[in-house]
Each structure stands twice: as structure tokens, then as C-alpha cells.
Amino acid sequence: MTGKPLVAILSGAGVSTDSGIPDYRGPNGLWRRDPEAEKLVTYEYYMGDPEIRRRSWLMRRDSAALHAEPNAAHRAVADLERRGVPVRVLTQNVDGLHQLAGVSARKVLELHGTARDCVCTGCGARGPMADVLARIEAGEDDPPCLDCGGVLKTATVMFGERLDPVVLGEAAAISKACQVFVAVGTSLQVEPAAGLARVAVEHGARLVVVNAEPTPYDELADEVIREPIGSALPALLRGLG
């Protein structure tokens, strides 16, 4: 490959498993082991039940994502940007590890939001997750918004919520414009994010799928890689510029 193509990287949970963050939908994922756990991140249940909120905050407090460090896959994406290759990251992950690895925040679209912030469902006030977790540690079960008293939630897209249409629109535009679309660590089963791969192919991009399990888009892909992401993604990206 010659030149420096625009590379769009759709990253899913599999990218962060080497950082100790579980793949919730995988064979041993939390949603399969404990279907009741989905209630903790389902908007209707969360808003309607203080006990669900209490348990949800405890889950956030104990989450591996808050203490995780970037792994080789995250660093490989950051290195691609440092080498001057035009790259945009469209991530389904909420852990913020792409940015911690050194990818410019303006190059990352967090399709499902971020677990590093909280937002008030009443007034929209936003702040660091760490501040709310400090209140949990101090003894609050269900800390309300300090501005309006409203219900606080993580700044992620819960089940039952819509993705931000502005973010999704920008992701679609990037998918249409890119020359290479890499889907890595994602089952490509969650819409509308998964459909970005089809958008890219329909607009002439080369599609590369890097995932342990088969995906619905493998037949559309120019290349399918089943090797471990921590070694496969760095090797792939080294060849792109």
C-alpha cells in the first residue's frame, strides 16, 4: 500500500480485554453469566429503582476500567497517529484507553459515551466519575446532582437510550471518507455502530476485520484476521504508513 490513506478504526471490547476489562458479550461475559446485571445499565430500570442505582454505583466503583492501563493495541493506534497517518477512532468502548495511550482526543469518537464522566439526567450537568465515586466511598448510596438534585448516571449510553445523533453522523461521515476501515475486537452485531463497516465498504474502503470470533461482516471483508489482537493489530497498522 502506498501513500497515507485515511484509516478509520472501529474498536470494540476485544481491544481492551488485554487491559483486564471483560468482554461483556463474550462466551464468558457478564451478560451471559448474569443476565440480571443488564438491569444495572438499562435506563428504564436505573431511573425507576433506587436499589438498581445503588448496585450500579457499586459496580462502577469496582469496575476494572477505572484502573486499567492501555495495552499494545491501544499503543499501536497512538503510534499510527504519531507517524502522521490520518486516523480516526470510532470506539464502542467507554474506558478512555485510546486517549490514555496518546491518541488525540479530537481523533476519538466515543460512540457509547465514556465511563470516566457522569451526567445529570435532570439539568445535564457533567463532571468526573471520580468525584461521584468519592461520594459513594463517603457513604452516599445514590448521590444526587449537586446542582439540581436530579438523578446522576454514568455518561455512557445505557440500554434503552439512543446514541447521540451528532456523534453517529460524524462517524458515518468518517466511514464514507476513509480508504481503510479496520473493525477490531468487535462482534459487529450491535447496530447502528456495526453498520459503519457496511457504509465504509459501500463507499469503496478496504475492510479489515480483526476478531477472535466470526462476524456478520466477514464475507464483506478484504481481510479477516483471527490472531490475538495485541499482536495482530500492531502488525497490521505498521503496514499502513
UniProtKB/Swiss-Prot annotation:
Main location: cytoplasm
EC number(s) recorded for this UniProt protein: 2.3.1.286
UniProt: NAD(+) binding residues: 13, 17, 25, 92, 94-95, 112, 186-187, 211, 229
Transmembrane annotation, as ranges: none
Any single Pfam family the record assigns to this protein: SIR2
Cofactor binding description: Binds 1 zinc ion per subunit.
Known catalytic reactions: N(6)-acetyl-L-lysyl-[protein] + NAD(+) + H2O = 2''-O-acetyl-ADP-D-ribose + nicotinamide + L-lysyl-[protein]
CC cofactor: Zn(2+)
UniProt enzyme class: transferase
Residues forming the catalytic site: 112
Gene3D superfamilies documented for this protein: SIR2/SIRT2 'Small Domain (3.30.1600.10), TPP-binding domain (3.40.50.1220)
InterPro entries listed in its UniProt record: DHS-like_NAD/FAD-binding_dom, NAD-dep_sirtuin_deacylases, Sirtuin, Sirtuin_cat_small_dom_sf, Sirtuin_class_U, Ssirtuin_cat_dom
Annotated binding of nicotinamide, by residue: 94-95
Amino acids binding Zn(2+): 120, 123, 145, 148
Keyword Transferase: yes
Domain Deacetylase sirtuin-type: 1-241
Cellular localization per UniProt: Cytoplasm
Keywords: Cytoplasm, Metal-binding, NAD, Transferase, Zinc
Any Gene Ontology CC annotation: cytoplasm
Keyword Transferase among record annotations: yes
GO molecular function: histone deacetylase activity, NAD-dependent; NAD+ binding; zinc ion binding
Entry's family note: Belongs to the sirtuin family. Class U subfamily.
Task of the protein: NAD-dependent protein deacetylase which modulates the activities of several enzymes which are inactive in their acetylated form.
PANTHER family: NAD-DEPENDENT PROTEIN DEACYLASE, NAD-DEPENDENT PROTEIN DEACYLASE SIRTUIN-5, MITOCHONDRIAL-RELATED
Name of this protein: NAD-dependent protein deacetylase 2
Gene: cobB2
